[in-house]
Regions:
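Membrane-anchoring alpha-helices and their flanking helix-loop junctions
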Residues: 1-103, 108-161
Length: 161
């Protein structure tokens, strides 16, 4: 379980920089450049993802059952996962109505995906993994909407000359 937790801290931590330290992120990108930032971000993300996969696979070998989901939850999970895939695809299709209406369909897709898995799985490893992603996505969506209202453009950091 320790590897799962460490992986979540690394992966979600680096993905939370924009949420908790956006100004620091901007200054760091200006100081070191976009490519070194993206390289470090990718390395930490990849290490976190590897630890999540490894830790989750280890935790599943000795599951700690917290609750037993009702049979109908699997059907609801399927529907929410389908919605998550639609939202994920909408994030990459330029100029579509879903993105125009929801503004951050990828984060909403992560929320839907995580909720689906929480509803359908009641063991500790699932709850830790998908609960963490659901909380991260909720905070991320809130921060992104605040940036939207403030007029901050996403993914477009260009240092001023």
């Amino acid at each position: 379980m320790a590897y799962l937790i460490l992986g979540l801290v690394l992966f979600l931590g680096v993905h939370s920089v924009r949420i908790v330290a956006d100004d620091w992120r901007g200054r760091t990108i200006t100081r070191i450049g976009a490519m070194p930032w993206k390289g470090a971000y990718a390395i930490v993300s990849l290490l976190g993802l590897v630890l999540i996969v490894w830790g989750f696979s280890q935790a599943r070998m000795t599951p700690t059952q917290i609750w037993s989901p009702p049979m109908g939850m699997r059907h609801l999970a399927w529907l929410l996962t389908w919605l998550a895939f639609v939202l994920l695809a909408a994030a990459y299709v330029p100029g579509n109505a879903i993105k125009a209406r929801l503004h951050h369909p990828m984060v909403l897709g992560v929320k839907s995906w995580a909720l689906a898995h929480l509803l359908a799985n009641g063991n500790l490893a699932h709850m830790l993994l998908f609960g963490s992603f659901l909380l991260w996505a909720a905070f991320n969506f809130s921060a992104a909407r605040r940036r939207d209202r403030a007029g901050v453009r996403l993914h477009r950091h260009r240092p001023q000359p």
